[in-house]
Amino acid sequence: YPKRTITYDNRLDFTKVKTLNFEEPDLKIFPCLGLAYEALAEGDSSCIVLNGANEVAVNLFLSERIRFTEIYDIVANTLEKHIKTDINDLDDVFEVDAWSRKIAMEMYNKR
């Protein structure tokens, strides 16, 4: 993972692209995108939790301690435990981020 197509020129030249087509993403195929939409709807602290938990889960995956599909489980379970809080300053951001990382690691250790 991921399966990648070999390309010989990695740059996208927008002056040569005639059209770009966008479709609604399939949230069954991309469930973490659904979590991001939910976090955006809930507000600031949820977005911070999503980010912190995702960073922990991705690092666990990259270090081969979890499967790719477990990223979703860790992030979703961390978000589920989160109680929305107001973010008033940078200290609040750091506090919520630290909490999310701690809970994400707890989720990993419980599995």
Residue locations for each model-derived region?
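Catalytic, metal-anchored helix/loop core of enzyme active sites in primary metabolism
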Residues: Y1-R111
